[in-house]
Every structure is written in C-alpha cells, then in structure tokens.
C-alpha cells in the first residue's frame, strides 16, 4: 500500500493501467508541456529532463503529494521518434522501424516537494521488428492506434504482431518500467507490501 498520496502527471492511459496493476490509489493530473528535444540532448537526457519537468510542474501545485512523471522515446539509428502527428508520419516511422532493432527509453521521476525528495531513473529496452509489408503498414495506420504512442506503435495493442523480440522491460516499452518504479517507491518508503490483498479484485470494480 502507498504511505502517501500519489499523483500520476501523465495523460497516458497505458501508464495509468500499469499503476492500477499494483492495486494502489492514485490521481491522474496530466502536465501539458512542450516535448521538443534540445539539440544538445541525448535520448536518455531528453526523457530524464522531461519526466522531471512534468513531475515538477504538478508537484509545485501539490507539494504534499508524491508526483510521478514519465516520458518515452523510440530511437533508431541515433534518431529520436516521438508521437506521429498524422498518417504520413506514422507510415514513415513504421517503415523506418521495419526489419530493424530500435531502442525504447523511458525516464521517470518521483518528486515529493514538501520533503525535498526526488528520484529520477532512465530505463532502456531493445525491440526487434519483423519486416512489415506495405499492406500491413497501411492497415495499421488506418486503425488510428499509432497516434499517441512514441514510435507510432502500441506494444500492448495491434502493434504487437510487428514484434519479433524484446530485450529488457516490456512495461518500459508500454511507457512505464513498473519493476523499477516499484523498487524506487519502496526505497523511498512510499510503498509497502504488508497486509492482505484478497479483497483487491472487489476494490477495483
């Protein structure tokens, strides 16, 4: 159970779904920021900065709460891929990823402003795509699934059949490395696993 109020500073339904797996109570208050990368940033630096800035923005409004911010990018051949803004961008991203391995970086930050507590971590996963035929790319782009996901695909959705192999955290590719988040919460003293969880199912209905 959580020992303090937790706020997820993200509008991502995937991140909320992953946190729900823990059976903990949390509030979603998205932070709306410019996610443009800086010229001098590496991908890990980019996601680390944005996750921290997202958490900091909401923590300033709720200094007593523990705020979780996160950011994810896909990187292939040194190029960062964010979220496609239109069908053309989605198609270009999938063509670029087809038959190749790419890296997914997710940065997450936990901030409790009143007590001056802050933790930030970046997690890396490698994903290998199959060769994707043109008709499959066209079908997937028309599904509308690509448009709010880094790299233009959803590992937990229809995009899963593009994937040959994942090395590293699956939940990291979804947008939140759950194992690392849990360990950080435990290390901060904000999450304990004492108590009976047999009523968890009824509490989630």
UniProtKB/Swiss-Prot annotation:
Family designation: Belongs to the Maf family. YhdE subfamily.
Catalytic activity of the protein: dTTP + H2O = dTMP + diphosphate + H(+); UTP + H2O = UMP + diphosphate + H(+)
Site description Important for substrate specificity, residues in chain: 14, 72, 156
Subcellular location: Cytoplasm
A GO CC term attached to the entry: cytoplasm
Domain of life: Bacteria
Active site: 71
Keywords assigned: Cytoplasm, Hydrolase, Nucleotide metabolism
One example of a Gene Ontology biological process annotation: nucleotide metabolic process
Record keyword Ion transport present: no
A Pfam cross-reference name: Maf
Protein name per Swiss-Prot or TrEMBL: dTTP/UTP pyrophosphatase
Keyword Cytoplasm applies: yes
Record organism: Syntrophus aciditrophicus (strain SB)
Top EC group: hydrolase
Cofactor: a divalent metal cation
Gene3D superfamilies attached to this UniProt entry: 3.90.950.10
This enzyme's EC code(s): 3.6.1.9
Role according to the record: Nucleoside triphosphate pyrophosphatase that hydrolyzes dTTP and UTP. May have a dual role in cell division arrest and in preventing the incorporation of modified nucleotides into cellular nucleic acids.
Signal sequence coordinates: none
GO molecular function: dTTP diphosphatase activity; UTP diphosphatase activity
């Amino acid at each position: 159970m959580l020992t303090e109020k937790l706020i997820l500073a993200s509008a991502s339904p995937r991140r909320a779904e992953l946190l729900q797996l823990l059976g903990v109570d949390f509030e979603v208050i998205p932070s709306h920021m410019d996610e443009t990368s800086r010229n001098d940033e590496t991908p890990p630096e980019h996601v680390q900065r944005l996750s921290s800035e997202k958490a900091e923005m909401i923590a300033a409004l709720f200094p007593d709460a523990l705020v979780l911010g996160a950011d994810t990018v896909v990187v292939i051949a040194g190029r960062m891929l964010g979220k496609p803004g239109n069908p053309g961008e989605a198609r270009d991203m999938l063509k670029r990823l087809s038959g190749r391995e790419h890296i997914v970086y997710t940065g997450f930050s936990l901030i409790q402003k009143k007590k001056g507590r802050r933790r930030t971590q970046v997690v890396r996963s490698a994903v290998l795509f199959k060769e994707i035929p043109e008709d499959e790319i066209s079908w997937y782009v028309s599904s509308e699934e690509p448009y709010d996901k880094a790299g233009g695909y959803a590992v937990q959705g229809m995009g899963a059949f593009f994937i040959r192999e994942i090395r590293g955290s699956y939940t990291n590719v979804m947008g939140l490395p759950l194992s690392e988040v849990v360990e950080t919460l435990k290390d901060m003293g904000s999450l304990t696993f004492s108590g009976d969880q047999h009523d968890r199912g009824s509490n989630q209905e």
